[in-house]
Amino acid sequence: MPKKILTGVVTSDKPNKTITVSVERKYSHPVLKKVVKVRKKYNAHDENNKFKTGDTVSIIECKPFSKNKKFQVMDESK
């Protein structure tokens, strides 16, 4: 099974070696017949504390680092 790769914006970099990434996706609502935006937050491992709030990053699924941290930062997206 391939690993998920997601792109989002860093919303928090307060914890050590951890960033919170907000990923936005769009889908067509079956009843409303409108395109709806949904945001979800993921905790990701940032080994060198390199990324700051507002950066756009790509994250990849990996083995769990902790209870809620199951993604790792791949690289910065432009």
Curated annotation (Swiss-Prot):
Transmembrane segments: none
Annotated keywords: Ribonucleoprotein, Ribosomal protein, RNA-binding, rRNA-binding
A single GO BP: translation
Pfam families cross-referenced by the UniProt entry: Ribosomal_S17
GO molecular function, one term: structural constituent of ribosome
One GO cellular component term: cytosolic small ribosomal subunit
UniProt keyword annotation of Ribonucleoprotein present: yes
Keyword ATP-binding attached: no
UniProt xrefs under SUPFAM superfamilies: Nucleic acid-binding proteins
HAMAP family reported for this sequence: Ribosomal_uS17_B
Stated role: One of the primary rRNA binding proteins, it binds specifically to the 5'-end of 16S ribosomal RNA.
Subunit details: Part of the 30S ribosomal subunit.
Family: Belongs to the universal ribosomal protein uS17 family.
NCBIfam families: PRK05610.1, uS17_bact
Listed name of the protein: Small ribosomal subunit protein uS17
Gene name of this polypeptide: rpsQ
